[in-house]
Amino acid sequence: MRSLGLDIGDRRIGVALSDPEGILASPFTIINRRDESLDIEAITDIISQQQVGQIVVGLPRSLDGSLGRQAEKVKEFTQKLCSHTRVPVEYRDERLTTVLAERLVQAVKTKKTREKVRHDALAAALILQGYLDEGREPKLA
């Protein structure tokens, strides 16, 4: 079962997909926000085409852990998305993933490679990978 990771922003939505085994997350695409219904349609098309069975949405929290206005926007959009799909959704704390993604993109040596890697999709992959890794950690008795 593939999992879909979303990094929802005001201008773009970063999208990541896991492999079918749910082990590795990779950046997939970026949706440039235009209209909410078109954004939802683009995501539901990906869900259908890629046979997604789980959605992980990055929830932007403040450093103190509180939810701000951006987190509320993400939750509102996610609720609307949920009304268009039966795929279960989970939230994952995304504090600092965009910053880490930007630093990783800057660390890439060539300009040509940097241009191909968009930090929004990479942030979505980091969010999704954290979720996948968390599910595989051995539980101590």
Tell where the protein language model's regions lie, with residue ranges.
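Phosphate- and other anionic-substrate recognition elements at nucleic-acid/protein interfaces
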Residues: 2-4, 11-141
